[in-house]
């Protein structure tokens, strides 16, 4: 397929790009080290041969990514499933979800789509702040990622957003791909998931017709992702204290790398994906004459309601809310054993935090809020 040249800097690698990209990857020492770590018993030549046999991005995902993610979920989760009864696996959609884990939110979704009979996986929106190493950028583009450019001037940001939106519309309409995009820029560190209006505004820059028609062309599906345990909870809490105590503190590239590694390999308990109905029909019920900002706010609120109301809540979520509010209002949702297990887990996560002036009470409150907020949001939809 002929891809417009304007997308060259952000699009995933296409099948015709793959031979050259594979050669680049296979000659990179860091990539070789990763392969040696992941496949200690397999000769490099055999992996190279298997990689070069992949003619499409989906071939690569089925040959490498699928088994890798399945292996992670087997070791670091007690189960992972997706409820997609509300959507049609013969169609393609833009999944817009809450964002917990840098890598696995979208990687596990790909596995779930394959397991649920979808004809293809997702093209994934990923920020260029996570792609400082050229070989990592190559690898994610092989794995069907398209790039969201960050840290731009206002003028550059407008041009970049328009190109990004045009590409998303092209991927859905012309390439017949699915797309995954987070409902906000970056993870919601406190798990209080809210759709950023700016994401919807960006998506409505591409396509044709009114705002409602443009968003309908992307076939948006609100997706709720629920992890029983977030392996990065202690890192997120640590970040809160660093931001509080150190003026102008900012994450470095190593922080993202540690979060990615911890998120992939850390224990997650149960993981659940729930796809709400595609919002095309809902969009048809809206008044197209509504003022633009009100329209975006209304659509964002609908997405939030769908995501919040379809969370899978675990006993630990209710324990966290009761501990935070010093009550037993939700004690019917957990047993004394559940509570003891969760409190032990929290103590273990707090013990991992290394800080010079460690504020235990503040850190504990932040971690508990991460587990309590999904309950608050879920209850607010009832």
Indicate residue ranges for each PLM-predicted region.
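Long, low-complexity C-terminal extensions of enzymes
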Residues: 295, 307-382
């Amino acid at each position: 397929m002929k891809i417009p040249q304007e997308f060259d800097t952000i699009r995933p690698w296409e099948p015709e790009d793959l031979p050259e990209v594979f050669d680049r990857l296979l000659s990179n020492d860091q990539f070789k080290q990763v392969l040696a770590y992941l496949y200690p018993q397999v000769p490099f030549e055999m992996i190279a041969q298997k990689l070069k046999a992949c003619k499409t991005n989906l071939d690569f995902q089925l040959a490498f990514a699928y088994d890798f993610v399945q292996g992670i979920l087997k070791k670091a989760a007690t189960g992972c499933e997706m409820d997609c009864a509300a959507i049609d696996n013969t169609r393609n959609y833009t999944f817009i979800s809450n964002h917990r884990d840098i890598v696995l939110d979208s990687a596990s979704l790909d596995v779930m789509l394959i397991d649920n009979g979808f004809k293809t996986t997702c093209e994934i929106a990923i920020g260029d702040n996570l792609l400082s190493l050229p070989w990592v950028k190559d690898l994610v583009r092989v794995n069907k990622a398209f790039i969201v450019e960050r840290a731009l001037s206002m003028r550059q940001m407008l041009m970049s957003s328009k190109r990004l939106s045009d590409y998303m519309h092209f991927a859905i309409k012309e390439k017949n791909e699915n797309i995954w995009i987070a409902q906000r820029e970056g993870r919601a560190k406190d798990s209080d998931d809210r759709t950023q209006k700016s994401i919807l505004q960006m998506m409505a820059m591409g396509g044709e017709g009114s705002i409602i028609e443009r968003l309908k062309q992307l076939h948006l599906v609100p997706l709720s992702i629920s992890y029983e345990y977030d392996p990065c909870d202690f890192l997120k809490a640590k970040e809160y204290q660093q931001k509080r105590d150190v003026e102008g503190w900012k994450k470095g590239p190593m922080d993202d790398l540690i979060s990615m590694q911890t998120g992939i390999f850390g224990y997650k308990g149960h993981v659940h994906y729930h796809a709400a109905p595609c919002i095309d029909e809902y969009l048809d019920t809206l008044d197209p004459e509504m003022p633009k900002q009100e329209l975006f706010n209304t659509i964002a609120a609908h997405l939030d309601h769908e995501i919040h109301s379809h969370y899978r809540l675990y006993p630990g979520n209710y324990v966290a809310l009761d501990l935070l509010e010093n009550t037993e209002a939700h004690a019917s949702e957990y047993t004394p054993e559940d509570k003891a297990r969760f409190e032990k887990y929290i103590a273990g996560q707090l013990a991992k935090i290394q800080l010079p002036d460690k504020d235990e009470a503040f850190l504990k409150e932040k971690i508990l809020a991460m587990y309590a907020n999904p309950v608050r949001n879920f209850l607010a939809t009832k």
